[in-house]
Amino acid sequence: MIRQYRHPVGQFLWEIPAGLLDVEGENAESAARRELLEETGYLAGTLEPLIEFFTTPGGSSENIAIFLARDLTLSEVRPPTEAEEADMLVEWVDFAVALESVLSSDVKSPSAAVGIMAAALRGQA
């Protein structure tokens, strides 16, 4: 997981790597691989589609696709970090701890909460 400061809420939040489809022609899986590398320095051997949802369908068309990354290896070459990624903390978190952190509201990122719960319900942790 990553811990990142989010100015609108004035807090550091536990999150999963995430980003935008901001490379022309890029699909969700390619973006997930790129963001994982940019934010953590890890490469995924496999990415499994986990869940996809609209964040606020009453007011936005924003769509989130979450993948479960497996067979991670630390990359020898890490892309330069953007300013927003400079203070990110990357930490391995035991899945049971992550799940309990969602249930106790310590994880407040909706993407992280939905992804962790989906992995738990699918028995993929």
List the predicted regions and their residue ranges.
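Conserved Nudix-box catalytic region and its N-terminal flanking loop in Nudix hydrolases
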Residues: 1-34, 76, 82-88
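Nudix hydrolase/Nudix homology domain
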Residues: 12, 49, 53, 57-60, ...
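Active-site segment of metal-dependent pyrophosphate-handling enzymes
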Residues: 6-8, 15, 37, 41-76
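Short loop segments at secondary-structure junctions
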Residues: 5, 25, 70-74, 95-96, ...
